Swiss-Prot record:
It comes from Nitratidesulfovibrio vulgaris (strain ATCC 29579 / DSM 644 / CCUG 34227 / NCIMB 8303 / VKM B-1760 / Hildenborough) (Desulfovibrio vulgaris). It catalyses: L-threonylcarbamoyladenylate + adenosine(37) in tRNA = N(6)-L-threonylcarbamoyladenosine(37) in tRNA + AMP + H(+). GO terms for molecular function: iron ion binding; N(6)-L-threonylcarbamoyladenine synthase activity. GO terms for biological process: tRNA threonylcarbamoyladenosine modification. This is tRNA N6-adenosine threonylcarbamoyltransferase.
Length: 361
C-alpha cells in the first residue's frame, strides 16, 4: 500500500510517500526564515505560503520518487491541532486527491503522528509512555497501540518549546531559538538553584512553563548585562561563544526544562498508568534538544525501559510522520469521509474514523 502524507499544521509544508511501512521519499519547505522577521509564526502568512508551495511540492515528490499519481492507494493529512488556515490548505489538497483518484482519505492527529514517527526507523514497543514536547504542546500519553492513545497530562499554558522561543527572544536571538540555547548551554555550567522546576509541587501530570519563563525574565532584569547587543546576538546565533554568564544561564534553563519533564514522567511511571509500560517514546521538536535526550535516556535506563526517540529530522513537523501514521491507520481499515473537518489548537480531536476492511485501498 502506498500512502501519501501531507503536513501543513504550522509553518512547514511537508509531503511524503510511505509504502508498506517504509519511507519512499519526502519533500519539505520551511518558512522559518520568513517568520523570523516577525519573531514568530504569522498565521496569515503561513497559510498563504502553504497555498503557494503545496502544488509544486506534490509534483516534485512524485517526480523524484518516480511514482505516478494513479499509484497512490491512500492520502493522509494532518487534521489538527494546528493553525486553522494552514490546516485547511492541506486538507483541501488532500480531499482533492482523494476525490480525484477515488482513494481513501485519512485525517491524522498531528500529535499522535509525532509519537509514531520513530516507527519509520525502528520497531515500536507497546504499551509505552509517550512524551510529546513541542512548540505548542507538552503532553504525556499512555499508548497501547498505534491507534490507542490516552492523554494523561497536558500543557496548561506555555509549552516547553514556546518557553524556549520566548527566552530566545528575550536574548535577541532569532526565531526559532531552541537550537541556539541548547548549543550555548553545552558550553556553560548549569546552576540547579538558578531556575525553578515549574509546576511540580503537586500530584498531577500537567505542565506549566510560564513560571520558568517569568523566572528567566526576572533574572535578566536583575542582570541586564547578560542580554547581548544586536550585533553580539547575531554572532551568538552564528555559532560564536556567548559570554560565560549567558552560557551558564542557558545551561541552567535547559536543565530546568529537562528535569521538569522527567519529574512528570517519573510520576506517571510510578502510578497506575505506568503499570506494564515497556518503552518511553519522546517526540516533537524539543525532543531534538540534547538535554531532553540525555535526561530521558537516564530515566529510561533507571526504569528498565526502551527509549524510543526519532532522529532529529523526524522530530520537527514533517510529511513522513503523517504518511506513516496514515498507513498504520489504513492497516486497521480506518478512514474518513470527505466531510472531515480541520481541528485548530485548543479543541479536542474527535475519534470519528470510519471502519472498513483492514489494509484495503
Amino acid at each position: 500500500m502506498l500512502c501519501i502524507g501531507i503536513e501543513t499544521s504550522c509553518d512547514e509544508t511537508g509531503l511524503a510517500l510511505v509504502r508498506d511501512g517504509r519511507l519512499v521519499h519526502a519533500v519539505m519547505s520551511s518558512q522559518a526564515d520568513i517568520h523570523a522577521l516577525f519573531g514568530g509564526v504569522v498565521p496569515e502568512i503561513a497559510s498563504r505560503e502553504h497555498y503557494r508551495l503545496i502544488g509544486p511540492l506534490y509534483d516534485l515528490l512524485l517526480r523524484e520518487a518516480g511514482v505516478g499519481p494513479t499509484e497512490l492507494d491512500a492520502v493522509a493529512v494532518a487534521r489538527g491541532p494546528g493553525l486553522l488556515g494552514s490546516l485547511l490548505v492541506g486538507m483541501a489538497f488532500a480531499k482533492g486527491l482523494a476525490l480525484g483518484f477515488d482513494i481513501p482519505l485519512v485525517g491524522v492527529n498531528h500529535l499522535h503522528a509525532h509519537l509514531l514517527a520513530a516507527g519509520l526507523e525502528r520497531e515500536l514497543v507497546f504499551p509505552a509512555l509517550g512524551l510529546l514536547v513541542s512548540g505548542g504542546h507538552t503532553h504525556i500519553y499512555r499508548i497501547e497501540s498505534p491507534v490507542s492513545f490516552r492523554l494523561l497530562g497536558r500543557t496548561l499554558d506555555d509549552a516547553a518549546g514556546e518557553a524556549y522561543d520566548k527566552v530566545a527572544k528575550m536574548l535577541r536571538l532569532p526565531y526559532p531559538g531552541g537550537r541556539i540555547l541548547d548549543q550555548q548551554g553545552r558550553r556553560g555550567i548549569a546552576d540547579p538553584r538558578l531556575f525553578p522546576r515549574p509546576y511540580t509541587d503537586n500530584d498531577n501530570l500537567d505542565f506549566s512553563f510560564s513560571g520558568l519563563k517569568t523566572a528567566v525574565q526576572t533574572h535578566l532584569s536583575r542582570h541586564p548585562e547578560l542580554v547581548p547587543s544586536p550585533d553580539a546576538a547575531q554572532a551568538v546565533a552564528g555559532g560564536h561563544d556567548a559570554p560565560e554568564g549567558l552560557r551558564n544561564m542557558c545551561a541552567s534553563f535547559n536543565e530546568a526544562v529537562a528535569e521538569t519533564l522527567c519529574i512528570k514522567l517519573g510520576r506517571a511511571l510510578d502510578g497506575d498508568d505506568g503499570v506494564g509500560v515497556r518503552a518511553l517514546i519522546v517526540a516533537g521538536g524539543v525532543a531534538a534538544n540534547s538535554y531532553v535526550r540525555e535526561h530521558t535516556a537516564r530515566l529510561a535506563v533507571s526504569r528498565g525501559l526502551e527509549l524510543i526517540v526519532p532522529s532529529p529530522p523526524l522530530c520537527t513537523d514533517n510529511g513522513s510522520m503523517i504518511a506513516y501514521a496514515g498507513w498504520l491507520l489504513r492497516q486497521g481499515g480506518l478512514s474518513h469521509s470527505l466531510d472531515l473537518e480541520a481541528v485548530p489548537r485548543g479543541r479536542a480531536i474527535p475519534d470519528d474514523y470510519r471502519q472498513g476492511p483492514a489494509g484495503c485501498s
